[in-house]
Curated annotation (Swiss-Prot):
Expressed by the venom duct. It is found in: Secreted. It comes from Conus miles (Soldier cone). The modification 4-carboxyglutamate is found at residue 49. The modification 4-hydroxyproline is found at residue 55. The keyword Protein transport does not apply. One of its GO terms (molecular function) is toxin activity. Residues 1-24 form the signal peptide. This is Alpha-conotoxin-like Mi20.2. Residues 25-45 form a propeptide. Belongs to the conotoxin D superfamily.
Amino acid sequence: MPKLEMMLLVLLILPLSSFSAAGEQVVQGDQRSDGLARYLQRGGRDVQECQVVTPGSKWGRCCLNRVCGPMCCPASHCYCIYHRGRGHGCSC
């Protein structure tokens, strides 16, 4: 099969949405890979202050941080950790 015919066949098989306007191939991931991309792009949000939800609570609501998601530790000397089998928590 000549190269031109092969190229036309490939273009017919591939959906047009898999290419950008510049002709570059665009990778369209599933929901899991999209979530990973958002996770990797949100590094600057980790520096926002935590808002304490209720006095005495060990958790506050804040920006999405890499370890604890939408939750964070309300005291500045605490940090988020992951306990195997128990989930996320604060270590002070």
